[in-house]
Amino acid sequence: MKVGLFIPCYINAIYPNVGVASYKLLKSLGVDVDYPLDQTCCGQPMANAGFEDESMKLALRFDDLFREYDYIVGPSASCVAFVKENHPGILEKEGHVCRSAGKIYDICEFIHDVLRPTKIPARFPHKVSIHNSCHGVRELLISAPSELNIPYYNKLRDLLDMVEGIEVFEPSHIDECCGFGGMFAVEEQAVSVCMGRDKVKDHMATGDEYIVGADSSCLMHMQGVIKREHLPIQIIHIVEILASQS
């Protein structure tokens, strides 16, 4: 199988180490992975802001670039969910059949559900608290949404439990939003910051050293709170742990 690696623009610009770790992780698991150098934004910021024409152009470019791969994998539940749930409708208005939406996966979802490894050759001797992003929980179902009252599961935890030396915790109010929400963080700054502060405190109450998640946008928001208030905790993307050898 041939896998196309999709790296969202904010990871490319702000957390390039997450993109590098994603590539290395997939290679270490025996995946034939390719990174298209001319990829661009998936169009989510434009669509969320109401710029339909701009988001359509980017959705069309994305589909043309990735549609020939067997799988498309990205380290962002938010952007992956946007492609999966919104690109078909956006492109339908142009008479274009979206071929990429049915084969795109968040990287953790892909490893857990498609590759199904029995072990991951990683070591991370630290305490971590899992952050479930809204898109990951409610659109990709990477973990069980608490409001559905269904049996517990968490694919992030399943993968982290394979890492040597790690201690994994989960905060109270595990499905509660961190307050980022894209444009929400700009338009409702005070509320967004308050939500972020509450979320970080929930994670800190577990006694962890790191907040770990699958969405760098959420982690970026909480990192802002942590830096502003000089809190003794760090953020880390899950792929950085799964690809870790130290």
Residue ranges: model-predicted function:
Residues M1-S246:
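Iron-sulfur cluster-binding electron-transfer modules in prokaryotic oxidoreductases
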